[in-house]
Structure formats: C-alpha cells, structure tokens
Amino acid sequence: MQTHEIRRRFLDHFVKAGHTEVPSASLILDDPNLLFVNAGMVQFVPFFLGQQTPPYPRATSVQKCVRTLDIENVGITTRHNTFFQMAGNFSFGDYFKRDAIKHAWALLTSSVDDGGYGFDPERIWVTVYLDDDDARDIWRDEVGVPESRIQRRGMADNYWSMGIPGPCGPCSEIYYDRGPEYGKEGGPEADEDRYIEIWNLVFMQNERGLGISKDNFEILGPLPKQNIDTGMGVERVAFLLQGVDNVYETDLVRPVIAKAEELSGRKYGAVHDDDVRFRVIADHARTAAMLIADGVNPGNDGRGYVLRRLLRRIVRSAKLLGADKPSMREFITVVRDTMAPSYPVLDTDFGRIETVAVGEETAFLKTLTSGSKLFEGAAESVKASGKSTIGGDQAFALHDTYGFPIDLTLEMAAEAGLTVDEEGFRTLMAEQRQRAKDDAQARKHAHADLTVYKELLDRGPTEFTGFHELVSEAHVLALISQGQRVPVATAGQDVEVILDRSPLYAEAGGQIADLGTLTGPGLRVKVNDVQKIAKKLWVHKVTVQEGQLTEGDVVLAQVDAAWRKGATQGHSGTHMVHAALRQVLGPNAVQAGSLNKPGYLRFDFSWQGALTEAQKQDIEVVANEAVAADYSVNTFVTDLDKAKSMGAMALFGENYGDEVRVVEIGGPFSMELCGGTHVGSSSQIGNVTLLGEQSVGSGVRRVEAYVGLDSYRYLAKERALLAGLSSSLKVPSEEVPARVEALVERLRVAEKELEQTRAQAVLAAAGTFVDKAQRVGPVLLVADSAPAGVGGNDLRGLVTDIRGRFGTQPAVVALLGDVDGKVPFVVAVNKAAQELGLAAGDLVKGFGPKIGGRGGGKADMAQGSGSDTSGIAAALDAVRGQVADKVGSQ
C-alpha cells in the first residue's frame, strides 16, 4: 500500500466517523518557543487548553512534523528521521477512551477491501498506564486483545503531559510484532526493534501541577472536559504494510536514495559508511524541501540555521559518495515528484524551493573544498602527534577562515575517530565577540582609553528619563576630551559629557540618538550625538556654543522635540513594517537589522529572493491599514520568559536581561522586545511609503520607507512628476504608464531600425575594400583603415563580409579603426590562405606593438585594440610585410 493511500485511508476513516478533516498546519507557527511543529496536536493546543472554542467537536489530520534534536544520528541508524507525518484523530470533550480505542482497532484490522489497513490482529500488542484499568478493560473485554498482549507501563512511558502545568493523562500505545527474525519475544517491554510502536492514544483527563521531571509531577484532579489526542506514524505504518525493513526503503524515501545511487555510481546496502550518507541525503532532502516550502530560508541562527545545516549535510554526503557535480537540484526534484500528491506546494512553489536549496549548495561547495583540506591537515597532525583531540584554535580557524560551523567540525572529527576541544573553541569565539565589541566602542569613541569610562561606570548607570519627559535637570558628572577627563570646556570646544540622568535617547536598537541641548545660566551646549558604554553609561557628544561648562554644573538637558517626534515615528513605523512583512510573507521574515531616524526607516530581514511587486504593495497596504486603525501603543516591563510566552518577538542571538521592555501595537498586530521610543498610537506614525527593496547579503533583503511628513513630501514629488508626464504626453495620469510603454516600444523599434541601417551602411563599404585588394603572391590582401568611427562588432562584421566575398581565393583582410583615440583592429584569414601557412593570430602579434596594443585569436579570426593612432600606417605596412614574407615567393 502506497504512503499516499495510507494517509487517505486514515482521513477517510475518521471523516466517516464524524470528524472534520483539518489540513496540516505549517511547520512554522508564530510561537517563539517552538522551533518547528513536531506533533499532530500542536495546532489544536488552544482548544485543549480552553483558550479557544473549537469550531468542531472532533477532528482528524495528517500533520507534517520536523524533529531535529538528534540530527547527528540520522543515517547512522534506520530509526532516526527529521521529517515525518503524524496522522491523528482528536476529540474536544466529545468521545473518550472507548471510542478512541475502537476507532484505532477498526482502522488497523479491517480488511483492505473495507477501507482498513488489514493488519493481523494476532500480532498487535498494546500498552496501558499502570493503573488505567478502564483502558485495559476496553482492550481486553470489548476489543478482544488477550491480557497476554497487554502490558502496563509507568509514567515515563505511558503518561502524557506538555511538560508544564496543564492537561495531562494516561496513554495507550499500539505495537505491531514484526516476527522472531527481528528480536526476542516478550512484547514491547522486551524488544522495541521487533515490536514497533505505530499509534499512541492519549487520554487527556487530568490537570497537571508543578513537577521536576517527565515522571515526577503532581496531578491536581480531573479536567472539566475529557479530550482525545492520538498520533499514528504514517511512515512506520508504510514500511510495515510495504513489507520493507525501515522507513528508508518505503515508496517516498527510496527514490531519493536511488537518485543518489545514480549520481554517485555506488550501491545502497553495500558499504555501511556509504549507507549512512545515502540515508542522510534521503532524510534531509525531504525535510529541507518541506521547510523551504513553508518559508524557512538558510541563516545563521534559529530555524534558518537548522535548514542550512540540513542542506550542508546533504552536500557533504553527496561529495563523500563521489558525486562529481552539484546534485541538490536532482534530489529536490525527486522529493517533489514523490511528495507533491500530498503536498501540492512542492510543485506550485518548486522554483523558489529549488533556488534556495541550490543557492546554499553553491555557496557551501566552495567552503567545503577549501575547509576540508585544512581539516584533513589538522586531523593528520593530531594523529601524528599521538593525540586524539583537535585543538580549539584549529576548530576556531576553520570557523573563522572558512565558515565551518562547529557542528560540522565535530561530525568530521567523529568520522576520523577524533574529538574536538569544544570548550577551547567557545572561549576563542567569546574572545572574538568581545574584541568586536571593544573595537566598536573604540571606533565610537575615537580609540580613546576606555579606563575613564570604566571608572564612571563603577559609580552607577545613567538614569534615562526620556520615556516620560523631554526636559530633565541633571548634574554634570564628568567632561572628557580626547580620552581624558577635563575640569572645564569653553565656547567652541567639542567634548563628551556624562550626566547622572538624561532624557536624550542614546543610539541603540537601530534608532539613532536624539539631538538636543544642555543649558544653564549663560550656558548653551549643542548635543550632537549620544552613545552608550556597556549599555549603562550615556556619553553625550557636544559642542559648547556659549559660556563655560564645568564638571559639577547643574544643567537642563533638553531633547529636540521635533527630532524626537520624527524618530519615534520612524521606530514605530519599523515595527509596523516588520509586522506587515510577517503577515504577508510569513513568520520567517525575521528582523536582521534596522535603522530608524526622523521620517525614514530601513529594515533588513531574512528572505530568499526579491519580493514581487504584489508582495511590496500588500506590505504597504497592511502597514497603512494598521496606521489608519489608530491602534494604541503600550509599553511594559516584564521577565523574558513571560514576554516570549505572550508572543513578543525577540531577535535571535541578542542578549537580553532578566527583565525586558515590551512594545505592543494593537494587541496581536505587533509585539516586540524593544528599548526604543515610540508614538502613543499608530495613527501618529502618519503614512508609510515603501521606497524600494534590495539584497544586502546572502538570504537578507532590505526595505526602506518614509513615514509621516517625509512620506507626504515624497508622494507630493511623485504626484508632481506624474502630473508633469501627464502634461507632456497629453494624456490623463492613469494612462501615463500605457503611453510610456508604447513610446518605449516605438523607441526600441526605431533603435533597431537605425542599427540595421547603420550596419548596412558599414557593409556597403565592403565592395570598395574588395576592389582595393592587393595581390601578394597567391593571396588577395586587404590591409587598410576602417571607415571613421567603425569598431567593435561592426568592424568584425565588415571584415567577415569582405573575407566572404573572395570565395575560395586565398585572402587576408586586416582593418584598423580609429574610435575615440583607440585603435580597434580585426584580422580575418580564409581557409585557402590558412593552408598557405597564414594565421590571423600570428599576424596581430606582429603588428600590435606598432599601435601600442595587443590582441589574439585563432587562425581564422583575431582581434584586439591599441592606443596609439599615430602607428596605424606602420601597423598596416607590418601586415603587408608579414604576408609577403610568408607567401610572396609562392
């Protein structure tokens, strides 16, 4: 029975039993705590937790799942897979144990003709929780499974919970006995290689309390509603019904291995190490294709890094199998052909899937070739010294120089029988990050001695008051000039000022610093920039305009209100654009960087390939609809875990403290961890106008936008431009695009006609040159200056035409042009002249130096260019001389 039919029979069985068929959820849910969907019940969690009312009392689905915790074990055994399909039936307070058990038994044991799978009931074993007599009684007394094939297990095996307080309950697992050739007797307790688990029935009947482990937590009591959550492994059922030993030999996976056999010339099942690589390719190609289809792009962290790792393992496995050319396209194509009947997106979106996968392959092949040589040298050196550990410095060099991720180095080391000093590697990585931070600080502070800032940090952080006020009274704690503390600064001096408190925003999180002033009696100081030291100390870079600023002064620190308003519009606009991107493109459009300043924003995000015009328009519409909705903007401080559980967006790789600030715009529309300043409501952002979109690196795109008055000014210019075009073209503005397109087409046709006319005029001169041909021995020679301004393809075409007019007579044509002070030249020698020993390439070498140039080519045609027009006559004489020397006596 084919896998597609297994899926279909499952769904049909439960639809007939009153269940609503629900499509598989995306592998990517908008949940910061879940890397990938890894179970069939994930999309139904809000129903099980009582957070939402289910629209149906019972449901069935086949959910695509990805688990990557044991990715390094994939291929080594036949039991590990990263991608699998979980078929399930679910009841939300409707039926319970009896119906769940009977539904499963009916589907498994009914004949194929009756819509079932036709499993032999005598080979089915079940397990139940230790004291779940209800389930035991149903299996034994109502279904008819003898007690000898029912085993009781404890909480670790047969009691389910989500790992946190919430629904929980006993479960009953269904196993199939493959026979004595696969292991010893005794049921699942004795041998889970022989007895394969195919279905797990979870009876959610209790509420879990706190606990410290999977099998040690408090059960608080019964739930008000009892639910059912089951999961049947589609691939496991497939290999049992197809009579093969494991998932890798089923109809959906074996074709990928077959393609790898074809490309490598090796056979699956012959050599263990090769088999590992075949299985890695087969598993990872399926997973990678499904992840890309759901919007994941290769990246350096989070989901993107998992995808990158999968693709790179495919590339390396193919190379180790001996594939002599890139193979990713071939593997992805097989995945499409086998799985698209169940997942049509693999077909409809194949172009993008292929582009992403092949792009990563192309980039990694360069890294793999160069990095592998360094690794092999390091491994040989370690073995030669009698040691077994590759040093952290060597692993760091692989990462730093060749981009080798540490997991690849670990994998290669294990294959070579070696280990890696991971602690040493991570120490060097930490040192590199610290150096980068120090360098950044040094650049911001003109490479000053940071000791002075450390002394000030030890006295405590700057109090930032700018969230609540734009003017604050502050004490001048220190003045710094060229890295040294100074007691006073006078008019005209540029210094750095440290205050005990400040309303001026220090550059951070993509938002540039506030502008403002420091004032006092007879004192006016312009604040040009504000930077942070160690995220705690505000360093104000200022120019003293009037008076004298002294350490210990009390000043009024004031933000430029217009500047701040524009900056908050830009920053809040960035959040709106981020939310709109994710709404249009999906949750994988994750922030990779940003810049916000008054009236303008720039946002970098992870994405593969250019956005379409329709996507850009949709993003702009979504953002402006949110602006028009006048959403309230709320900020609050909470702990990091709670913020993430609420769905707040956090940047991968960013270090957050225990407490974080959350900026929420319109409830669920946008919620991000952010320390920046923002508007009070979304309508204060004003219009959002996207300016364009471009690539800024591998897998990273950038959008730019104007907001507020800058957006209106931009649109006013665009409107004026359109009005001008409308007036010039004498058509209504809505007809301008069509009229411009028509004019461009007319111009294209005219240019083509002009080019044809010009080419014909050039070729018309061919007859004149033929008439002027000189006879040198048996050869007809044209050695002359080309018509004025003729060069490039025109010159080549003219020379070719002249040569052709001589027919079978031996002929040499050499024309030199004069175009903008350059001397293009082309020499053509026909076959008859070549038989006399003449070659175009030899001729250009002879006369090239006369015009300060060089050229090259083959015997029939050669060309080049010189820079000395005064040497044209001498060069032509040289051509005549070379031909005469070669054939003059013949």
UniProtKB/Swiss-Prot annotation:
Zn(2+) binds at H571, H575, C674, H678. InterPro entries: aa-tRNA-synth_II/BPL/LPL, Ala-tRNA-lgiase_IIc, Ala-tRNA-ligase_IIc_anticod-bd, Ala-tRNA-synth_IIc_core, Ala-tRNA-synth_IIc_N, Ala-tRNA_ligase, Ala_tRNA_ligase_euk/bac, DHHA1_dom. Its EC number is 6.1.1.7. PROSITE patterns: AA_TRNA_LIGASE_II_ALA. One of its GO terms (cellular component) is cytosol. GO terms for biological process: alanyl-tRNA aminoacylation. GO terms for molecular function: alanine-tRNA ligase activity; aminoacyl-tRNA deacylase activity; ATP binding; tRNA binding; zinc ion binding. Binds 1 zinc ion per subunit. CDD domains: AlaRS_core. SUPFAM superfamilies: Class II aaRS and biotin synthetases, Putative anticodon-binding domain of alanyl-tRNA synthetase (AlaRS), ThrRS/AlaRS common domain, Translation proteins. Transmembrane segments: none annotated. It catalyses: tRNA(Ala) + L-alanine + ATP = L-alanyl-tRNA(Ala) + AMP + diphosphate. It holds the Pfam family tRNA-synt_2c. It is an enzyme of class 6 (ligase). It comes from the Bacteria. Coiled coil: none annotated. Catalyzes the attachment of alanine to tRNA(Ala) in a two-step reaction: alanine is first activated by ATP to form Ala-AMP and then transferred to the acceptor end of tRNA(Ala). Also edits incorrectly charged Ser-tRNA(Ala) and Gly-tRNA(Ala) via its editing domain. Consists of three domains; the N-terminal catalytic domain, the editing domain and the C-terminal C-Ala domain. The editing domain removes incorrectly charged amino acids, while the C-Ala domain, along with tRNA(Ala), serves as a bridge to cooperatively bring together the editing and aminoacylation centers thus stimulating deacylation of misacylated tRNAs. NCBIfam families: alaS. This is Alanine--tRNA ligase. It comes from Rhodococcus jostii (strain RHA1). The lineage of its organism: Bacteria, Bacillati, Actinomycetota, Actinomycetes, Mycobacteriales. The gene is alaS.
